[in-house]
Amino acid sequence: EIIEEECKINKIKFSKKEFEEYLKKHQELSKTASAGRFKSGLADNSEATTKLHTATHLLNEALRIILSKDIKQKGSNITPERLRFDFSFDRKLTSEEIKKIVDLVNKKIQESLDVVREEMSLKKAFESGAQGEFGAKYPEKVSVYTIKNFSKEICTGPHVKNTKELGKFKIIKEESSSNGVRRIKAILEN
């Protein structure tokens, strides 16, 4: 009704039937595009995907510690089989760097660190040192997941309660995603 009124005021041709058909097509397209995809880049909400999601947070911080504090997440995709993590970095990782990253992630898994969720304002989250995905749009109130004394990120979850639930972390591939962006694919083994 509001749209019809605005169209009349602005002398714009409006067909309610065409509008409803367009809206229905758009909704179907949106459903298709987002099928099996949550906002957090997760393919589903399974235990395996949840574990890999938590491992992604460990990986992100390990990259920042081993390579550079300037590293920013550029995207992720997590399925029950593997995680894919894109990050800002301008060169191929050496085998020594990959080993250090894997070792650090596995060390944090073995330390049995608690994963704690807090809700806070976006401003407070950034002031507290929480990392966020570059270019992401966040609501005013956000969830922040902290992996005890290691990682702190704005995230919608879900996560395990403790890193000991994860198993052994292993990078299976490191490659270029695009100019200035690297991609890591990794798995968790029992």
Locations of the language-model features?
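A glycine- and charged-residue-rich anion-binding loop/surface
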Residues: 1-190
